[in-house]
């Protein structure tokens, strides 16, 4: 009988602790007179009516697990009903932030849930705000990680930046007319339902980053989606409203479930990393209205197969499709003049690319390790390649270089292990370090008369290389190991009358055999009587002076033209 009574008493005691404590105040700053020090850590459910100021919120914060100076307390308050309360100016600072050379004190204002008022109050689960509140301040409920329900009255017209960030809210509906602020629901991983007002024009930075939302209806008035606005969320599909002009940096980056994006026909800007690491995205049909497509915008989209780039685009930015290893099809618009570094690096399924006439430069590692690419035909307009731009394109069997190139840079075509022949065009002056190194099947190389320098290891580790044709009348300067580890029975073909020079030149003298070959359609520059020169061009058709060396085309007053070498 005694045991039964004791058990019942314990149960009744627990029930009392869970029961709502009701406090009525006549004067702000007197909450501590109603709740004693002995009680404050025992109350889990509290309802307050009457005025509250900063002094009262010191106690409420303490009861909810965080003291005035943001140190953890033993508070256990889970449910707080302030429906019939009001917030008034006055009292002590409810929160003191220490930092740098100055401390910041936060005081209450009339009808406002203040800045960081309940920041990191980890025990709060259910809060009902006063019906007179008009604003919720920045970081008000930041990191209230147990807060799953928040009743916000219609009187609230503003919710501050990061006010509800890292809470456990499962659904949220912004009232019509309310602007969305930066990071307002950032990191709310439990948030599965979200309603955005129909008149919103901007979704700012971090607003819904890291949330659990899978579907969202974007308002028809929307013009901009800000930086990281939906990043790392669980969104599966995006339908861009016709009003949308800008998708900013990282707006949908790291969204692992995003499979479909329907762009509108007025979109102008897709920012840096906008869809980076969206590993389920399959296709990107970018409208022709887009004029700015930022760096890494679709990088590491590991399932992306098909892309349509907008006509009018002038530059493919850095790492735009870096590590999109399933990308099979992409167009490069005729208007593109520049392809940035890493633009298509590690696109393992990309078997063909058509480069437009007008393309001027290709950046560092731009097509590195595109190991199914079969052909590289560079336009005549291209005058600049950067380091390792086609390094590791193992299945390329045909390379056509541009006559506008002056230098083939370091590692540009190294490890292109299927290429058998390379014909370097007239106009190239320098072949860079390891430019054609480790091309396992390379057998024949033609070096033009304009080349003056071969940098170290430029043709090294080409074990099948048996035939090198060098048209330079003066042996080009060679760096260390320029032709190291080529076929043993190798032959160097040089212009008529230059064999002795090559036999005594460093590196060239190491060839097993040196053979002179007759040049065709090229004459030594000679003087003809009664005929004078009217124009002179280089091999690319550009007008030059008579002080230039190399292969030239000279027009004479009698109407004849002569291809000559000077």
Which residue ranges define each predicted feature?
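C-terminal tail/sorting-segment detector
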Residues: 1-3, 551-566
């Amino acid at each position: 009988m005694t045991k039964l009574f004791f058990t019942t008493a314990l149960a009744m005691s627990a029930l009392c602790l869970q029961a709502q404590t009701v406090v009525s105040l006549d004067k702000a700053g007197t909450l501590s007179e109603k709740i004693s020090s002995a009680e404050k850590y025992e109350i889990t459910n509290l309802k307050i009516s009457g005025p509250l100021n900063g002094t009262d919120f010191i106690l409420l914060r303490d009861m909810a697990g965080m003291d005035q100076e943001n140190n953890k307390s033993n508070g256990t308050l889970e449910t707080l009903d302030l429906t019939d309360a009001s917030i008034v100016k006055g009292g002590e600072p409810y929160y003191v932030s220490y930092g740098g050379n100055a401390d910041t004190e936060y005081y209450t204002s009339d009808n406002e849930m203040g800045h960081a008022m309940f920041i990191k109050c980890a025990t709060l689960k259910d809060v009902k705000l006063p019906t007179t509140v008009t604003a919720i301040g920045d970081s008000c409920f930041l990191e209230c990680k147990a807060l799953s329900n928040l009743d916000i009255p219609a009187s609230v017209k503003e919710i501050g930046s990061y006010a509800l960030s890292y809470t456990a809210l499962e659904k949220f509906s912004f009232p019509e007319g309310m602007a969305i602020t930066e990071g307002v629901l950032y990191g709310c991983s439990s948030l599965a339902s979200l309603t955005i007002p129909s008149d919103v024009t901007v979704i700012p930075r971090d607003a819904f980053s890291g949330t659990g939302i899978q579907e969202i209806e974007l308002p028809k008035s929307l013009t901009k989606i800000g930086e990281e606005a939906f990043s790392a969320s669980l969104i599966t599909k995006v339908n861009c409203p016709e009003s949308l002009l800008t998708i900013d940096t990282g707006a949908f980056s790291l969204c692992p479930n995003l499979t479909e994006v329907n762009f509108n026909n007025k979109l102008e800007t897709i920012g840096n990393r906008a869809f980076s690491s969206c590993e389920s995205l399959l296709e990107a049909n970018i409208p022709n209205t887009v004029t700015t497509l930022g760096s890494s915008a679709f990088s590491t989209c590991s399932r992306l197969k098909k892309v349509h780039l907008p006509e009018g685009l002038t530059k493919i930015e850095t790492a735009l499709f870096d590590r999109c290893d399933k990308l099979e099809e992409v167009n490069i618009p005729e208007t593109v003049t520049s392809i940035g570094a890493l633009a298509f690096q590690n696109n393992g399924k990309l078997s063909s690319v058509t480069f437009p006439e007008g393309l001027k430069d290709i950046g560092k590692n731009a097509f590195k390790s595109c190991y199914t690419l079969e052909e590289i035909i560079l336009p005549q307009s291209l005058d600049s390649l950067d380091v390792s731009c086609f390094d590791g394109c193992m299945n390329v069997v045909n390379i056509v270089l541009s006559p506008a190139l002056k230098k083939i840079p370091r590692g540009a075509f190294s490890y292109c292990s299927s290429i058998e022949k390379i014909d370097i065009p007239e106009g190239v002056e320098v072949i860079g370090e390891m430019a054609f190194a480790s091309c396992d099947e390379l057998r024949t190389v033609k070096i033009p008369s304009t080349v003056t320098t071969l940098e170290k290891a430029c043709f090294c580790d080409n074990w099948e290389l048996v035939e090198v044709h060098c048209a330079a009348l003066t042996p080009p300067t060679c760096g260390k190991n320029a032709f190291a580890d080529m076929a043993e029975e190798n032959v160097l073909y040089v212009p008529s009358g230059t064999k002795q020079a090559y036999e005594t030149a460093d590196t060239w003298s190491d060839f097993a055999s040196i053979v002179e070959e007759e040049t065709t359609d090229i004459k030594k520059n000679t003087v003809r009587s009664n005929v004078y020169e009217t124009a002179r061009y280089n091999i690319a058709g550009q007008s030059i002076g008579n002080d230039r060396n190399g292969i030239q085309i000279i027009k004479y007053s009698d109407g004849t033209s002569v291809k000559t070498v000077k």
